[in-house]
């Protein structure tokens, strides 16, 4: 039976980030992942699932030694952001230079980030990648946790990290309750070709019951879109003919970049918010979507998860250096308190933002238009908003 210090269940982006961060710490780490990593084809069309990687996540990925690998594959730097309310005067825009930054963030395909982290973990002598591996049983002992895999093999760990996604099996097994709400929206994602170049600006428009984001890709005429719509409308748009879809898209987007045409399949998935009542318990810590999921309004989901990883890496290294038991809940509380606070703030902010920007009530529309206008013109507001979006208010000590 193999024994490790830390068993990470789920080899997605956040789970692998924790593993890579613990490399060289003296802790033995195993990552259990259900799927084997496929090689990335350099000439493959852009994947539909992308993330807006902010400055905080960039700092983490740089410290983990994978950022250059990501940039060398496919990542699109963006220098500006525009947000507006359709058919009204509400509008706010940001650009990096006026704020004193070289860029605001990068749009990166999730598969590119994942591949870079997987490679890094694979090259590390103190990380064992077990894939394909599926958990069948978990038993929480006083001093260690016993994990049984579907193939019958067993593993013990002093700490188990649940990085197994929004429907976390580990979270359920640990009987951690979940606050759950349905945003009553579905997200449609696709790759779009624009007539005019996107100029490395991320754009977001609020229209009636929907929110449409255009995220600039490496090709100056390609954008990845996230279109948040009612479930019925999202289904209708997914099944619509290309002409019909393009027409609706151009109307919703105010023809900002000339005629836009869909270039890929259209995927739809439901949007739900989740918040675990605990982010840790005896011999267990939750990270990423296993702990929280938010509305992908600004592509911020993975940034929140990466900051969980950054905080947990620092905490586990500190405990290990001090000779403390890394699986004791009393020691994991510090991680839990810090990340629950950050996640709650982000969830509340997103919920408030969504409530304000959904619906066509004239009074609400006027209120949000005035809010956008004031944020755009009042001194001192934009720098704060940008710092928040870049994740610079939420950096653990070791990344500052």
From Swiss-Prot:
Protein name as it appears in the record: 2-octaprenylphenol hydroxylase
Keywords: Cytoplasm, FAD, Flavoprotein, Monooxygenase, Oxidoreductase, Ubiquinone biosynthesis
Record's miscellaneous remark: Partially complements the C5-hydroxylation defect of S.cerevisiae cells lacking COQ6.
Cofactor(s) named in the record: FAD
GO biological process, one term: ubiquinone biosynthetic process
GO molecular function, one term: FAD binding
Subunit structure: Homotetramer. Component of the Ubi complex metabolon, which regroups five ubiquinone biosynthesis proteins (UbiE, UbiF, UbiG, UbiH and UbiI) and two accessory factors (UbiK and the lipid-binding protein UbiJ).
Localization per Swiss-Prot or TrEMBL: Cytoplasm
Family to which this protein belongs: Belongs to the UbiH/COQ6 family.
Organism, as annotated: Escherichia coli (strain K12)
InterPro entries xref list: FAD-bd, FAD/NAD-bd_sf, Ubi_Hdrlase_CS, UbiH/COQ6, UbiH/COQ6_monooxygenase
Chief subcellular location: cytoplasm
């Amino acid at each position: 039976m193999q024994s490790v210090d830390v068993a990470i269940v789920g080899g997605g982006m956040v789970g692998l980030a924790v593993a890579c961060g613990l490399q060289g710490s003296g802790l033995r780490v195993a990552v259990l992942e259900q799927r084997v990593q496929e090689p990335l084809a350099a000439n493959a069309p852009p994947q539909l699932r992308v993330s807006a990687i902010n400055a905080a996540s960039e700092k983490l990925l740089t410290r983990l030694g994978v950022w250059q690998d990501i940039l060398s594959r496919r990542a699109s730097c963006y220098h500006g952001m525009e947000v507006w309310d359709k058919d009204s005067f509400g509008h706010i825009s940001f650009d990096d230079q006026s704020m004193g930054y070289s860029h605001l963030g990068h749009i990166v395909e999730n598969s590119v980030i994942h591949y870079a982290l997987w490679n890094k973990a694979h090259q590390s002598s103190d990380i064992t990648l077990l894939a394909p591996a599926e958990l069948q049983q978990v038993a929480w002992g006083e001093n260690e946790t016993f994990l049984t895999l579907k193939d019958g093999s067993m593993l013990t760990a002093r700490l188990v990290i649940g990085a197994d996604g929004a429907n976390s099996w580990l979270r359920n097994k640990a009987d951690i309750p979940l606050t759950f709400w349905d945003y009553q929206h579905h997200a449609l994602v696709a790759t779009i070709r624009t007539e005019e170049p996107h100029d490395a600006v991320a754009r977001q428009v609020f229209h009636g019951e929907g929110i449409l984001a255009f995220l600039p890709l490496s090709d100056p005429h390609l954008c990845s879109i996230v279109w948040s719509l009612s479930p019925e409308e999202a289904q209708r748009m997914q099944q619509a003919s290309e002409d019909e879809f393009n027409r609706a898209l151009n109307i919703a987007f105010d023809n900002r970049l000339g005629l836009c045409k869909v270039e890929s399949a259209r995927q739809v998935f439901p949007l739900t918010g989740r918040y675990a009542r605990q982010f840790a318990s005896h011999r267990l810590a939750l990270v990423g979507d296993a702990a929280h999921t938010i509305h992908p309004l600004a592509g911020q989901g993975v940034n929140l998860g990466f900051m969980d990883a950054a905080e947990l890496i620092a905490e586990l290294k500190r405990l290990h250096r001090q000779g403390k038991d890394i699986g004791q809940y009393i020691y994991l509380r510090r991680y839990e308190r810090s990340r629950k606070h950050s996640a709650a703030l982000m969830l509340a902010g997103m919920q408030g933002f969504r409530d304000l920007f959904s619906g066509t009530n004239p009074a609400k529309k006027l209120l949000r238009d005035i809010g956008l206008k004031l944020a755009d013109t009042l001194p001192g507001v934009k720098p704060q908003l940008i710092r928040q979006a870049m994740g610079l208010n939420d950096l653990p000590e070791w990344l500052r």
